[in-house]
C-alpha cells in the first residue's frame, strides 16, 4: 500500500475545515517520510496522523498489495469492524501470515511478540498507525482479569485463551501465565492443563483479591505490567528504527 496521510486546512467563505489528504508515497509531494532503517522492511510513521478509516478502507480496496492489519484488542477491533476491507485483513499474532504490507493499529506489549509478528509476516513495508495504550490501575486491572476468569469458567469450560487476555488488556502473555499461577497458589482455581496458548482451569471461587494484591509475586507481575506499558509507549513515541532493531 503506497499511501501516506496528512491533514489539509481548507477555507471557503470564511468557513475553515480540515480534510484528510491521502498521498502516493512515490509522489514528489510526499509528506509522510520513510524512516531510515537497517531492517529488511521499510518503516512508515503514521503515529501522529489524524486518519479517516473510511478513506483507508477505500485505499486498501484499490491496492494490489497483500495487506495485513494487526489488531488483538477488542476495543480497537470494534472501531474498524464496520469497514469491510480493513476488517477482513485483521489478524492476531497467531493468524499472521506472510504479506507485503503490515499495518499496526494495535501495538504488541513486548519486543518478543513484535519480533514474532514481523518474522511471520516478512513484510516489505510496515505502517505504525496512531494508538492509545490501555492503562489501568491495579484494582481495575485485576477486576477485569477476574471477570475474564469467571467468564471462562462458566461459559468456556474453564478454557482461558491467553492471547485473548493479552489482546484485550494490552499486556504480554507471560503476565497472564504468572497471574493464573498466582491465582492457583492462593486457592482461587486449579490449573488442569496449560500450554503457551491457553490454560484449562477448575474454578474454586474468589473471596478476597487482597490475597493477590499483597503477594510478593504480584509485585513482580506488576513490574512486568509496567514494562509492557513502557514498551508500547516506546513504540508510540520513540525512534521506530531504534526500537525495531
Regions found by a protein language model. Give the residues of each.
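Acidic, two-metal ion nucleic-acid-processing modules in DNA metabolism proteins
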Residues: 1-91, 99, 103-106, 135-245
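Long, low-complexity, charged/polar intrinsically disordered regions in eukaryotic proteins
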Residues: 100-138
Amino acid at each position: 500500500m503506497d499511501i501516506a496521510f496528512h491533514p489539509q486546512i481548507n477555507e471557503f467563505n470564511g468557513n475553515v475545515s480540515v480534510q484528510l489528504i491521502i498521498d502516493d508515497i512515490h509522489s514528489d509531494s510526499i509528506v509522510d517520510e520513510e524512516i531510515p532503517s537497517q531492517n529488511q522492511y521499510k518503516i512508515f510513521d503514521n503515529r501522529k496522523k489524524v486518519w479517516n478509516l473510511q478513506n483507508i478502507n477505500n485505499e486498501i480496496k484499490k491496492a494490489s498489495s497483500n495487506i495485513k492489519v494487526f489488531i488483538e484488542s477488542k476495543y480497537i477491533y470494534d472501531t474498524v469492524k464496520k469497514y469491510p476491507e480493513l476488517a477482513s485483513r485483521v489478524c492476531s499474532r497467531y493468524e499472521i501470515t506472510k504479506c507485503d504490507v503490515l499495518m499496526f493499529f494495535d501495538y504488541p506489549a513486548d519486543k518478543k511478540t513484535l519480533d514474532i509478528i514481523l518474522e511471520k509476516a516478512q513484510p516489505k513495508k510496515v505502517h505504525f498507525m496512531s494508538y492509545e495504550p490501555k492503562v489501568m490501575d491495579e484494582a481495575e486491572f485485576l477486576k477485569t482479569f477476574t471477570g475474564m476468569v469467571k467468564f471462562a469458567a462458566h461459559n468456556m469450560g474453564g478454557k482461558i485463551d491467553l492471547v485473548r487476555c493479552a489482546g484485550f488488556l494490552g499486556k504480554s502473555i507471560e503476565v497472564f501465565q504468572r497471574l493464573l499461577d498466582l491465582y492457583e497458589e492462593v486457592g482461587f482455581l486449579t490449573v488442569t492443563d496449560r500450554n503457551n496458548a491457553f490454560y484449562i482451569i477448575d474454578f474454586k471461587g474468589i473471596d478476597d483479591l487482597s490475597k493477590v494484591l499483597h503477594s510478593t509475586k504480584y509485585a513482580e507481575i506488576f513490574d512486568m505490567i509496567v514494562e509492557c506499558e513502557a514498551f508500547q509507549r516506546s513504540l508510540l513515541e520513540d525512534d521506530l528504527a531504534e526500537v525495531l532493531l
